Amino acid sequence: MRVELIVNGEMRTVEVEPRMSLLDCLRERLLLTGAHAGCEHGVCGACTVLIDGAPARSCLMFAVQADGYAITTIEGVTPGPGELSPIQDAFCETHGMQCGYCTPAMILTAHALLADNPDPTRADIVDAISANICRCTGYAQIVEAIALAAERMRGLNRPARKP
C-alpha cells in the first residue's frame, strides 16, 4: 500500500504493509531513527512525534492512518545542519538528558507546548511532559530546560556568547 506523508516538511511516498505502525515506517522505511520503540503499547512516550503539530504516539498509529498528514520528527526540529533548536540547546545546557532515550520525545512535546503556550507555568510544563517517561533525570532538569527555552524563545535570558 502506498502512503504519502509530509515528513519534516518534505513529501515522502512510502510503500507499507497495511498494519505497519507509523513508528516502524519512520524507522525502517524512511531511516529516521529519532523516535524510539519503548513499550510499543503507547505508555512510555518514547515514540512521540508531532502530527500536524500535536504530540502523538507513533507506535499506536498505522502508517496508512498518517497518509497526508504533516509529521515532525526530532530530525526535523533543527534550524539547519549542525545547529540546535532553542529547546535542544536548553536541554544541553541544563543537563536535561542522561541516557537520551526519552529526549527526542521530550523535545518534540516541548515544541508543541511552546507553540501553543510561549509562556508556560511550571505546572503547564509538568502536565505537557507527563505522558513521557524518563527513568534517569527525575524530570527536574527537563522542566528547567523547557522553562529556559521558553524564556529564550521570548527574547529573555540570552545564552552567553560562545568564543
Regions found by a protein language model. Give the residues of each.
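Signature of N-terminal electron-transfer/Fe-S-associated modules in redox systems
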Residues: 1-163
